[in-house]
Amino acid sequence: MSPTDPLDDEDTFKILVATDIHLGFMEKDAVRGNDTFVTFDEILRLALENEVDFILLGGDLFHENKPSRKTLHSCLELLRKYCMGDRPVQFEVISDQSVNFGFSKFPWVNYQDGNLNISIPVFSIHGNHDDPTGADALCALDVLSCAGFVNHFGRSMSVEKVDISPVLLQKGSTKLALYGLGSIPDERLYRMFVNKKVTMLRPKEDENSWFNLFVIHQNRSKHGNTNFIPEQFLDDFIDLVIWGHEHECKIGPIKNEQQLFYVSQPGSSVVTSLSPGEAVKKHVGLLRIKGRKMNMQKLPLRTVRRFFIEDVVLANHPNLFNPDNPKVTQAIQSFCLEKIEEMLDSAERERLGNPQQPGKPLIRLRVDYSGGFEPFNVLRFSQKFVDRVANPKDVIHFFRHREQKGKTGEEINFGMLITKPASEGATLRVEDLVKQYFQTAEKNVQLSLLTERGMGEAVQEFVDKEEKDAIEELVKYQLEKTQRFLKERHIDALEDKIDEEVRRFRESRQRNTNEEDDEVREAMSRARALRSQSETSTSAFSAEDLSFDTSEQTANDSDDSLSAVPSRGRGRGRGRRGARGQSSAPRGGSQRGRDTGLEITTRGRSSKATSSTSRNMSIIDAFRSTRQQPSRNVAPKNYSETIEVDDSDEDDIFPTNSRADQRWSGTTSSKRMSQSQTAKGVDFESDEDDDDDPFMSSSCPRRNRR
């Protein structure tokens, strides 16, 4: 449909829908560095050409939680280029915006700000890549919101319960209730749904007249018993769900026969993992809503780098390959070379009809060498395609297929972790590795004081959010709590009794999940507070504080038996940090990257002794060591096991969750009209004008509910 289609009247919402844009992905790569920015430019251009009312993003606008200056600058540049202008906005917000955007310093929609000239508003929830972190719980979307380019909604301020208040929009006679829920850890949100702690508030008046649109960013496919959100958990009054986080493009609305709503999964706009789901052609959606009818038009993205993947099982070609043949390796290389050439030919044919597509495609040939075969040197083989593919280092991946045990063949659990190439394990999470390690570890190395879940959360904060104090603060907090427990119980100072009481206390905390959640939150808040204090104290240093000669520092540090050698012409401004010979860290005194995370001042001589003796240390010795040796450096463990996640979307059937009715009301200023709301069900009356409605072919079915 063209922008001047007669169906696009004054009563029809036109919404451009996209998710998982991942700005900044591989931005330092010489070939793929600009892919995300080019595709984001195309998405915004499609919105402008189709004259949409607004853009709806389903999370993960940024790939990194703390995007680089280049990424943030490019994003702001494109939003300013396409979303600002004199074209009037044709819809109005009639809900209480102080509730919808209450966490913002500017709690109103951006196009109603008199200081801004917005022609295409952007509404977005946050994803798991760009979620709020730090002491102030801010994310990159909050920066865009403060700048006036994005309306960040769907943020939950509580970790115990979630009340989802819709943004109520109206265009002509069409009323749209826009619900959003930013990314929450799946296991926590799953538990909230089970405990009926998630409430979707509804308009109190004229419930039947609203089209209910819900945007969510969670696991849709099953990755574990509670590590996903079943569609059956969602309220049945919803008309359409826009599901982010899953990268495979399934943008055509699919009806859930149990809940009777439709689910659209737009998928990502960039290939972030070389897995089969990413090979599906990428689209964004042009969603039209008129009354209670909707239509989703697929808009192909033409600037996405094409990705071709193919699997080869050597054992399936006994006439070509014999593992006992001394020249079988040369035969396998020739076979793989032929397969890759075929994929390159297919990529070239597709590109001939689309000049906007990048020149070098992504190629992945997965070779199953089980059956007695041996892999060859992949790097040497890949040198043949350096100038022809965008991923020359991992064109071929060798793996061995592992049989799944305990399968009946009737029902497949698509969420079980199976063997997968390490580069394809994009859905594997850090806390899963921690939990899996301690579940399979021997008894003598099992945790006896700390909890697996707490350690998993702390490691995730350290790796994903670069909270360098997360692990240390969690250990310190749980140790302090255990010590208080033992003091209150007046336990005899016998090692056996202390060990037994500590184990009992740990088991009781594991059974009480709410208490364990509180522990993790308290430890993480401590870590964020420490980081904020560190950043504040660092920024408070003046030039006078740092401008004294290093010769003075050398004299002051004589007790440490470390000699500081002043460098030529750079003696001033370095004294308090110590000489460069003490550490390889850059200027500034600490490294906060993922591989270091500990400040230089903590790398004392006692840390090595602590880490070397901690392996066989009893609990009572650990208590003593906390007073004698405050430094904690734990040698990292390497996990070489590769995990594979099946991305199939086959759903298990879950019983419908009963929900309590709740009512609410809100008041607004002259700029934001009032609207009271409730959580009762909707009576769907028969539409008498279906024959005349232009959206009949894609309309929602007529439903009768209490």
Curated annotation (Swiss-Prot):
NCBIfam families given in the database record: mre11
Compartments it resides in: Nucleus; Chromosome; Chromosome, Telomere
Biased composition (Basic and acidic residues): 505-514
Record entry for activity regulation: Interaction with SAMHD1 stimulates the double-strand-specific 3'-5' exonuclease activity. RBBP8/CtIP specifically promotes the endonuclease activity to clear protein-DNA adducts and generate clean double-strand break ends. DYNLL1-binding inhibits the activity of MRE11. MRE11 activity is inhibited by C1QBP: in absence of DNA damage, C1QBP interacts with unphosphorylated MRE11, preventing formation and activity of the MRN complex.
Residues with PTM N6-lactoyllysine: K671
Cross-link annotation Glycyl lysine isopeptide (Lys-Gly) (interchain with G-Cter in SUMO), location: K384, K468
Stated family: Belongs to the MRE11/RAD32 family.
Gene: Mre11
Requisite cofactors: Mn(2+)
Cross-link type Glycyl lysine isopeptide (Lys-Gly) (interchain with G-Cter in UFM1), residue numbers: K282
Biased composition (Acidic residues): 643-653, 684-694
Role according to the record: Core component of the MRN complex, which plays a central role in double-strand break (DSB) repair, DNA recombination, maintenance of telomere integrity and meiosis. The MRN complex is involved in the repair of DNA double-strand breaks (DSBs) via homologous recombination (HR), an error-free mechanism which primarily occurs during S and G2 phases. The complex (1) mediates the end resection of damaged DNA, which generates proper single-stranded DNA, a key initial steps in HR, and is (2) required for the recruitment of other repair factors and efficient activation of ATM and ATR upon DNA damage.
GO cellular component labels: BRCA1-C complex; chromosomal region; chromosome, telomeric region; cytoplasm; Mre11 complex; nucleus; PML body; replication fork
Compositional bias (Low complexity): 580-589
Superkingdom as given in the UniProt entry: Eukaryota
Changes seen on gene knockout: Early embryonic lethality.
Active site: H129 (proton donor)
Binding site for Mn(2+) 1: D20, H22, D60, H247
Listed name of the protein: Double-strand break repair protein MRE11
Pfam families: Metallophos, Mre11_DNA_bind
InterPro entries: Calcineurin-like_PHP_ApaH, Metallo-depent_PP-like, Mre11, Mre11_capping_dom, Mre11_DNA-bd, Mre11_N
In-chain residues carrying the UniProt-annotated modification Asymmetric dimethylarginine: R570, R572, R574, R576, R577, R580, R587, R592, R594
